[in-house]
């Protein structure tokens, strides 16, 4: 697959803007779990030679990969769905939080108004309470202009050495 450097220009789509924010904040490792809403970002990550992309099969596995990248001196990020947040609780608490590892988590926030898959709705009710219970800061992107906050959120995540959830809902992706 063709690898390219940082993209530029006014016509840049939201996925490219997200990846450029990753590069600007020196994120060099991204692991992803397949998600239809996040497919554009995953494709954009794959195109950049500044980012080592490792797809994974399970979000808890992705937490371990990110921990390894961080311990190896590379800033990590995981891209995942909120419906799998529950399976990452142990990895987040016992590994990422216990060892004070910064980890931005770009999470598709499935299950809100406009969701077409009924089974996604239940986890949407639990996503924010789980993050609050774990003391993980979360930011909810509803509209395309919310992307303007991403660089500051990433910078804060690495400064504070804590995981952070960036929840991007269907309205964010449809507005992009």
Feature annotation, model-predicted:
Residues 2-176:
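Thiamine diphosphate
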């Amino acid at each position: 697959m063709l690898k390219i450097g940082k993209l530029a220009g006014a016509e840049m789509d939201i996925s490219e803007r997200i990846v450029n924010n990753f590069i600007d904040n020196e994120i060099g490792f991204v692991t992803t779990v397949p998600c239809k809403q996040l497919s554009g970002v995953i494709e954009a990550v794959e195109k950049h030679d500044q980012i080592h992309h490792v797809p994974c099969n399970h979000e808890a596995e992705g937490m371990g990969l990110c921990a390894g990248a961080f311990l190896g001196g590379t800033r990590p990020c995981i891209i995942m769905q909120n419906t799998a947040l529950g399976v990452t609780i142990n990895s987040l608490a016992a590994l990422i939080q216990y060892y004070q590892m910064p980890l931005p988590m770009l999470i598709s926030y499935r299950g809100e108004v406009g969701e077409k898959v009924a089974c996604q709705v239940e986890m949407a009710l639990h996503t924010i309470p789980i993050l609050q219970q774990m003391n993980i800061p979360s930011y909810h992107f509803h509209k395309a202009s919310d992307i303007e906050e991403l660089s500051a959120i990433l910078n804060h995540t690495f400064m504070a050495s804590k995981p952070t959830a960036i929840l991007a809902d269907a309205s964010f992706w449809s507005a992009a």
